[in-house]
Amino acid sequence: MEKIKYGFGEIEAAASDIQSTSGRINSLLEDLKAHIRPMAAAWEGESAQAYNEAQQQWDSSAAELNTILSTISNTVRQGNDRMSEVNRMAAASWS
């Protein structure tokens, strides 16, 4: 029979890593924008409008991704906390 094994520290580290991934993505996107900005500043008319619309969609998608990553991180952390509490209650039942 296999045992259930729960690594509380590892799960907390995974939740933190998921959350920090959001920051890394934002940093990379800002770097990309900084590289594009000089070129985009020269665009006019339809080119500028098309870029701005695409950039708004990109920003919206990035914000949505950040929300999803935050939700996943929080859910993992909450599950870990709940399992830790169940573990404490089980241990206390033997006292």
UniProtKB/Swiss-Prot annotation:
Show the Pfam families listed in the entry: WXG100
Q: Which residues form a coiled coil?
A: none
Q: How does it assemble?
A: Forms a tight 1:1 complex with EsxB.
Q: What else is known?
A: To improve expression in E.coli the proteins were cloned as a single protein in the order esxB-esxA with a cleavable thrombin tag.
Q: Which family does it belong to?
A: Belongs to the WXG100 family. ESAT-6 subfamily.
Question: What protein name does the entry list?
Answer: ESAT-6-like protein EsxA
Q: Which organism is it from?
A: Corynebacterium diphtheriae (strain ATCC 700971 / NCTC 13129 / Biotype gravis)
Underlying gene: esxA
